[in-house]
A protein has these predicted regions:
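Sec-dependent N-terminal signal peptides of Gram-negative exported proteins
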Residues: 3-20
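Acidic, polar-rich low-complexity tracts and alpha-helical solenoid repeat scaffolds
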Residues: 17-213
Length: 213
C-alpha cells in the first residue's frame, strides 16, 4: 500500500510539473548581432581591475607582485589618458595614475600629476589631489605648503569626511606654527559639524583644550 501511495505521489508530482512547464512562456528571441567592444570603457576597467588586485592584502605581502601590478595599472591609466584625452573619465584616470606613482615611490612624478589636477580637475579631484600634496608636504616639514593645500581641500571638498579631516589637520598645523586663533577656528569648525566623525570631534576638542590651557 505504501508503495502504491508513493507511486501515485510521484505521478501527481510529475503531472503538476508538466502542467507548470506548459505555462512557461517561450524565451524571447536573442538577437544575433555581434558583440560591440568599448575600448574606452575596457581600458579603464582593466586598469581598475589591476589596481584592485594590487591592493589585495595577500598581494601587498609579495612586494614584487605588488609592484608589478601597480606598474601594469599605471600603464593602463596612462594609456587611457593618451588614447581618450577628451573623455570625461580622463581626469579620474590621471588621478589614479598619480596614486600608482605614489605607491611605487615615484613621488615627484605623482606630484606633477596632482598639481595639474588641482588646476584642471573637478572640485572632487582638486580636493583629493590637494589632500595628497598636503599630506606629503606636511610629512616633509613644508608647513606653509601643507597649509595652502589643506585650505584648497576645504574649499573644494564635496565629501564631508574629507573636509573634516582637512580642517582638523589644518588646525594642528596652525597650532604647531604659532597661529592659535586660526587653529581654534579649525577645531571649532570640526566640533560644530553635526556630521563630523566622532574621532575627529574628540581630537579637535583636545586640540582646543590645549589652546585654552
Amino acid at each position: 500500500m505504501k508503495a502504491f501511495f508513493s507511486i501515485n505521489a510521484g505521478l501527481i508530482t510529475l503531472a503538476m510539473f508538466s502542467a507548470a512547464q506548459e505555462n512557461i512562456p517561450d524565451a524571447a528571441p536573442i538577437a544575433d548581432g555581434p558583440l560591440v567592444a568599448n575600448p574606452e570603457l575596457d581600458t579603464l576597467d582593466m586598469a581598475d581591475m589591476l589596481y584592485k588586485q594590487a591592493q589585495a592584502p595577500a598581494t601587498k605581502e609579495n612586494r614584487q607582485e605588488y609592484g608589478r601590478l601597480l606598474d601594469l595599472s599605471l600603464r593602463k591609466y596612462l594609456e587611457f589618458t593618451q588614447r581618450f584625452p577628451q573623455s570625461a573619465q580622463a581626469p579620474l584616470a590621471e588621478y589614479r595614475a598619480a596614486m600608482c606613482l605614489e605607491e611605487l615611490g615615484r613621488k615627484d612624478e605623482a606630484h606633477g600629476l596632482f598639481l595639474r589636477l588641482i588646476q584642471t580637475g573637478s572640485p572632487a579631484l582638486v580636493a583629493a589631489s590637494a589632500y595628497r600634496l598636503a599630506t606629503d608636504a606636511s610629512s616633509a616639514g613644508e608647513i606653509d605648503k601643507a597649509i595652502q593645500y589643506y585650505q584648497l581641500v576645504i574649499r573644494n571638498a564635496e565629501q564631508n569626511d574629507l573636509k573634516v579631516d582637512a580642517q582638523y589637520r589644518l588646525g594642528r598645523l596652525f597650532l604647531s606654527s604659532g597661529n592659535p586663533e586660526s587653529a581654534a577656528t579649525m577645531f571649532c569648525a570640526v566640533m560644530g559639524n553635526p556630521e563630523a566623525d566622532a574621532k575627529f570631534v574628540l581630537v579637535s576638542r583636545m586640540g582646543y583644550a590645549a589652546l585654552c590651557a
